[in-house]
Regions:
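Membrane-interface helix-entry/capping residues at the boundaries of transmembrane alpha-helices
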Residues: 39-43
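Alpha-helical transmembrane segments of integral membrane proteins
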Residues: 5-38, 54, 84-175
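Hydrophobic alpha-helical transmembrane segments of membrane transport/permease proteins
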Residues: 1, 69-91
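Juxtamembrane/interface motifs at transmembrane-helix termini
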Residues: 59-63, 76-80, 95, 163-165
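Membrane-water interface segments at the C-terminal ends of transmembrane alpha-helices
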Residues: 45-76, 103-109
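Short, hydrophobic secondary-structure boundary micro-motifs
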Residues: 1, 57-58, 73-75, 132, ...
Length: 175
């Protein structure tokens, strides 16, 4: 694969993994604590985050992290003129991938959090959940062993389409 395509794949895979690591626990928490203040706050932030186009998030993050704070590079995938090897090359690549991965992750949090929450709320309202609670199972067992397993199927279905569509967004972010 060409280097640019490989970079796109790395950015998309890492941003998807980071987004899932955030959205799954957040969506489960919001579903379990439905209509609480924290759920309402997350829902408002999710809608706002979902409404902002990814290129606007990219411009804001470039301005904040690269221009104002000077923490991250604006372009490139490695330090110019240096041929690092081993772990140092890996750290250099991670440093240059941080801003695009951060933008792609933040751009995907809103929609996925809302979808995980909706799937979990639907699963938690099923009869088998009521039966599991009536049997005296611990709430963690009910949530993770019963509800999450059944909410996972629609989440995976949407995740596949979302992962494919994220490639089109990464073309804009990488420019």
């Amino acid at each position: 694969l060409p280097a640019r395509m490989l970079n796109t794949i790395y950015i998309n895979i890492f941003s998807t993994l980071v987004a899932l690591a955030i959205t799954i626990p957040l969506g489960i928490y919001c579903a379990v604590h439905k209509r609480s203040k924290s759920d309402n706050a997350v829902q408002v932030l999710s809608i706002v985050g979902y409404s902002i186009p990814v290129y606007i998030i990219a411009l804001l993050f470039i301005w904040l992290f690269a221009v104002t704070l000077k923490l991250l590079p604006v372009f490139g995938m490695q330090t110019p003129g240096n041929n690092f090897t081993g772990f140092r090359a890996f750290l250099d690549k991670v440093y240059y991938m941080t801003l695009p991965v951060l933008v792609m992750t933040v751009g995907s949090l809103g929609g996925m959090t809302r979808y995980v929450r909706a799937a979990m709320i639907e699963a938690l309202s099923m009869d088998y959940i009521r039966t599991a609670r009536a049997k005296g199972l611990r709430e963690k067992v009910v949530i993770y062993s019963h509800a999450w397993r059944n909410a996972l199927l629609p989440v995976i279905t949407v995740l596949i389409g979302w992962f494919i569509s994220i490639f089109s967004g990464s073309l804009i972010i990488e420019q």
